Amino acid sequence: VLRGTRHINRLGRPPRNGDTLNKDMEDYLFTNLLDSISNKFMAQTSDELCRRMDVTREQADAFAALSHQRTEESIRTGTWSEEIVSIQVDGKTIGPKDEDHFVPGTTRQSLSNLRTHFGPDSLVTAGNASGIVDGAAAVVVKSLDRAKSDGDEPLARIVSWGIVGLEPAIMAYGPVPSSKLALDRAGASIDGVSRWEINEAFAGQAVACMKDLGIDQSIV
C-alpha cells in the first residue's frame, strides 16, 4: 500500500493556529515553502518559469478557471465518489466531503479580479494556485500474478518513471524533463499519450509545462 499525507496545518507552529505559552511561532511560508538555494518561494519559482516561457496571467487564469469548472462538474456527477472515503477522528465520522478549495461558478473573468501575492509581475493569486490544505491518498500496488490470485482487476500498469534534478529557481519545470525521461525509458513518445496529469500547485506552472511539452490542455 502506497500512501501519502499532506497535513500542512501541523508543520511548524504557524501563527494562524494561535500561539501557546513557551512555544516558538513559525511562519510556514518561510519554514516549508522557501527554497534555501535560490531564495525563492515555491510560487516564485513558478513565476520565474512563466517569465522564461512567456506565459501570461490570462493564460494562467484560463487554465485555473477550467480546473475549477472541471472540479464542479465532477462533484455534480459524482465522478470520484467511489474513491473518497470517510475517516474516524476521536470516535466521530468525518466525510466524505466535497473538494473544499474550489469556488463554484468560477470564471476567467472572476479570477482576473484577484490580486497577485508575490510582486507586481507575479502571476500567482489565490484563485490560480492550490490552497494550503490537509489531505491523504493511498493506492494498492501488486504484481499481475498476485492481483489475479486475489481476484483483483488492475486499474493501471506502472511502465516506467523518471526523476530529474534541475535549477532550483525553476523547480516548477520539473514535470517536463521527468516526463520525457519516463517516456524514453518506456520507449514511448509524447504524441502517444492520450491523458496527462501535471499535479502541481500553480496554474501558470502547468501552462508552462504543457507549452514546453506541446500538449493540449484538453487532455491534461
Could you tell me what each predicted segment is?
Residues 1, 61-66, 84-89, 152-163, ...:
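Beta-strand segments within the central parallel beta-sheet cores of soluble alpha/beta enzyme folds
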Residues 1-48:
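Flexible glycine-/small-residue-enriched beta->alpha junction loops
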Residues 24-30, 116-125, 157-164, 218-220:
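Glycine/charged-rich beta-loop-alpha catalytic/anionic-binding loops adjacent to active sites
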Residues 33-41, 51-54, 58-65, 122-138, ...:
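Active-site pocket-shaping loop/turn-to-helix segments
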Residues 49-54, 147-154, 180-195, 210-216:
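Phosphate/pyrophosphate-binding loops at sites that engage ATP/ADP/AMP, CoA/4′-phosphopantetheine
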Residues 59-149, 212-219:
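N-terminal extracellular/periplasmic Venus flytrap/periplasmic-binding protein-like
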Residues 96-101, 168-175, 200-218:
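Short glycine/threonine-rich loop-to-helix capping motif typified by GTGT followed
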